[in-house]
Amino acid sequence: MPERDSEPFSNPLAPDGHDVDDPHSFHQSKLTNEDFRKLLMTPRAAPTSAPPSKSRHHEMPREYNEDEDPAARRRKKKSYYAKLRQQEIERERELAEKYRDRAKERRDGVNKDYEETELISTTANYRAVGPTAEADKSAAEKRRQLIQESKFLGGDMEHTHLVKGLDFALLQKVRAEIASKEKEEEELMEKPQKETKKDEDPENKIEFKTRLGRNVYRMLFKSKAYERNELFLPGRMAYVVDLDDEYADTDIPTTLIRSKADCPTMEAQTTLTTNDIVISKLTQILSYLRQGTRNKKLKKKDKGKLEEKKPPEADMNIFEDIGDYVPSTTKTPRDKERERYRERERDRERDRDRDRERERERDRERERERDREREEEKKRHSYFEKPKVDDEPIDVDKGPGSAKELIKSINEKFAGSAGWEGTESLKKPEDKKQLGDFFGMSNSYAECYPATMDDMAVDSDEEVDYSKMDQGNKKGPLGRWDFDTQEEYSEYMNNKEALPKAAFQYGIKMSEGRKTRRFKETNDKAELDRQWKKISAIIEKRKKMEADGVEVKRPKY
């Protein structure tokens, strides 16, 4: 082995008597678990001789380093801290020699600084008139005792010269005061207990031989009369419920405690059984029957007869003793506040109604203005004006503003119908003239009876056909998803007709009805045709412009 740090190392040597020359015999003698147990159970033999000198791994190394030894380091540390402690004690001794404990001097009565002030305070305590020897002696003793107590305890907590938290004497004084107070309180608490024990002693001596005697004694002497609270009388507290209030359902119930004079007395409150209730009801019904027969009118045959004299008991009122109900005229402040609130609400409602009426009047005026403008536009239309295309939305005129306009609209509609022409051809010229006057509103009451001519023209015994009338659909209109295909839905929308209820109420029966919506079928071919027409129109327009000599922007392909 190579040497490290000039120290030779060697492999450990085998113990004495161990021979490993024959490896075959070593392999044959294998140890088992039993051999291992025996080895564990046999005690270790004491060494007969010293360990061999060749094994040097337990020896101290040649060069000993004191810093690496933990015991040496511990000793050094102890000596260092001992020196520090000694220096600290010496410093405290020096400070104690220079420091003067004035509080200790004051407690011992050796304080030189307060000698002059004590003389002044003691001379002020003496009286002007010389007292007797005994009084002087007792006063001096008391004064000396007070001085000593003030020196030791420091006087009262508020006026003491001791510092709270620094002087131990003040803490002792406060503790003594707290202990004395607690003792006094305990004595006060124990006094009534002792007195009650003294009172109970003679009673405890009583012995009862029977249960009956014990019960009699308890009922006579031990039963305590219950103190009645005058506030809790039967029927004194009642719930106040305002039936006129809008928020009566959610209002918090308020309680009212009535005065004793208003409360019903116990004598007045009679407990009625079921029989008494039935009897009272029967008497009430009989009294009603008597009053009803007396107030009936006499028949013709009984008019001449004199009224039979009734016994005085029949007219007696069973509720004679009960006085009439006198309502209180004064209202509570809460009722007054509610009345004011309701008045304010009524005024607001009136103002709102007025505003609504004004708005309606304005709307009516606007409608009349629009109707006049439409009439003027119709008059201005020329004969050769283009008809409206199907794609353009049709303006549905609103109802007429007055009865005259309603009659005019009826005349215009019926003048173009075939049935009306047939009836006109059958009539005489005089009737035509009268009818013209009738529709012209020259001399008739048609304004008051707007449906008169309508009833004359279309009156029949058959029932009116209400199949086309728009009676309203509670489930809502049919939509796209109520049909299987788009074609069925478009066919339904094209054929859908509905007449307003007003037409049936006023007697106007339209032949074809009104289509609710202009639903047009859109297919690819129609769309392509429309686009081709637009493109061809643009091309024609450009050709005309080129022919006229106008420069046209040419697209780049």
From Swiss-Prot:
Region (17 X 2 AA tandem repeats of R-[ED]): 342-375
Modified residues (N6-acetyllysine): 98, 137
Main location: nucleus
Domain of life of the organism encoding this protein: Eukaryota
MF (Gene Ontology): identical protein binding
Keyword Ubl conjugation (UniProt): yes
InterPro entries documented for this protein: Red-like, RED_C, RED_N
Modification sites for Phosphothreonine: 485
Cross-link Glycyl lysine isopeptide (Lys-Gly) (interchain with G-Cter in SUMO2) placement: 151, 310, 331, 386, 388, 404, 408, 496, 501, 509, 541, 543-544, 553
Keyword vocabulary terms for this entry: Acetylation, Chromosome, Cytoplasm, Cytoskeleton, Isopeptide bond, mRNA processing, mRNA splicing, Nucleus, Phosphoprotein, Repeat, Spliceosome, Ubl conjugation
Comp. bias intervals (Low complexity): 42-53
Membrane-crossing segments per the record: none
Extent of Basic and acidic residues compositional bias: 16-25, 304-313, 332-398
Modified residues annotated as Phosphoserine in this record: 287, 417, 460, 536
UniProt subcellular location: Nucleus; Nucleus, Nucleoplasm; Chromosome; Cytoplasm, Cytoskeleton, Spindle pole
One GO term of the biological process aspect: mitotic cell cycle
Short name of one Pfam family: RED_N
GO cellular component, one term: cytoplasm
Region (Disordered): 1-84, 181-205, 294-402
Compositionally biased spans, kind Basic residues: 294-303
Function in brief: Involved in pre-mRNA splicing as a component of the spliceosome. Auxiliary spliceosomal protein that regulates selection of alternative splice sites in a small set of target pre-mRNA species. Required for normal mitotic cell cycle progression. Recruits MAD1L1 and MAD2L1 to kinetochores, and is required to trigger the spindle assembly checkpoint. Required for normal accumulation of SMU1.
Family: Belongs to the RED family.
Assembly and interaction partners: Component of the spliceosome B complex. Interacts with SMU1. Interacts with MAD1L1. May interact with DHX15.
PANTHER family: RED PROTEIN IK FACTOR CYTOKINE IK
Designated name of the protein: Protein Red
Top-level taxonomy: Eukaryota, Metazoa, Chordata, Craniata, Vertebrata
Gene name linked to the record: IK
